[in-house]
């Protein structure tokens, strides 16, 4: 089943659309030490990658926490069941179908994203869309957590240096997500010149396409927030940045 687009879809409609489907049984999230050079950055960031030569570059990871672990922080069990178990799984399944027999078979996920991105294209290819969304969601799950720990000093200092204050960064990050027209993502990235920047991208486009390192990403497709926040995207973004982000995971990507 194709992932839901940016249309307003009620929780009842989503349940009907996915009726009969059950959450997949997945292998545990694994980090693999034998990687090609282009994969090193993603591996050090803690993002699952697939070694070159492995046919199936798309594998759905388990969540790094229970489905109900984020509910007290504003992201319900139902949202994670739909978002991870069905939407993300659809990107994995569709991506594997499109990858089979293509010139990109055997490449790493990161290599596929970069190779299939077409700058300036009105619509990206099906393989790119599914590969990039798979990569995006791998990062999304990893930068959230129920721990609620304080922001590490190294990250705080870097944000103050780049934005003037942590509060200004949070303001810019939420504004980028709220200002993204239609489906997309907002990001905290380290640019090629080393500077920290807030960016936004449409649909499944991600920082890999521009040679940037993603430190934090937030999904602003409607399926990511409609169950819990209905059409209130700004409230979802405020809740994400203030309650859901695992700042230690973000710091590890620096």
Residue map of PLM features:
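Charged/polar low-complexity intrinsically disordered segments
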Residues: 14-16, 25-26, 39-41
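Intrinsically disordered Ser/Thr phosphorylation hotspots
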Residues: 10, 22-23, 50
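Cationic, low-complexity basic patches in intrinsically disordered or flexible, solvent-exposed regions
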Residues: 3, 16, 32
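Short, Lys/Arg-enriched N-terminal segments with co-localized hydrophobic residues
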Residues: 34-55
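Extreme N-terminal basic, low-complexity initiation segments
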Residues: 2-13
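Cationic, amphipathic, low-complexity segments that mediate targeting or membrane/lipid association
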Residues: 21-27, 31
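Feature for soluble, non-membrane regions of globular proteins
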Residues: 51-254
């Amino acid at each position: 089943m194709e992932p839901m687009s940016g249309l307003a879809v009620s929780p009842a409609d989503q349940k009907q659309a996915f009726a009969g489907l059950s959450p997949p049984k997945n292998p545990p999230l694994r980090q693999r030490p034998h990687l090609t050079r282009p994969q090193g950055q993603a591996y050090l960031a803690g993002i699952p990658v697939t070694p070159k030569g492995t046919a199936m570059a798309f594998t759905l990871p388990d969540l790094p926490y229970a489905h109900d672990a984020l509910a007290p922080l504003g992201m319900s069990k139902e949202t994670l069941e739909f978002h991870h178990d069905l939407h993300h799984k659809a990107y994995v399944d569709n991506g594997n179908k499109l990858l089979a027999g293509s010139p990109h078979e055997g490449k790493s996920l990161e290599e596929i994203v970069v190779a299939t991105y077409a700058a300036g294209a009105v619509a990206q290819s099906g393989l790119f869309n599914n590969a990039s969304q798979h990569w995006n969601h791998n990062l999304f799950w990893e930068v959230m957590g129920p721990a609620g720990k304080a922001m590490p000093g190294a990250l705080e200092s870097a944000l103050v240096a780049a934005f003037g204050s942590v509060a200004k960064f949070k303001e810019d990050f939420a504004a980028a997500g709220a200002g993204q027209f239609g489906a997309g993502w907002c990001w905290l990235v380290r640019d090629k010149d080393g500077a920290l920047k807030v960016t936004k991208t449409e649909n499944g486009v991600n920082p890999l396409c521009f040679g940037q390192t993603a430190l934090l990403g937030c999904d602003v497709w409607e399926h990511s927030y409609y169950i819990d926040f209905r059409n209130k995207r700004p409230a979802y973004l405020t809740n994400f940045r203030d309650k859901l982000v695992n700042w230690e995971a973000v710091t590890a990507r620096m």
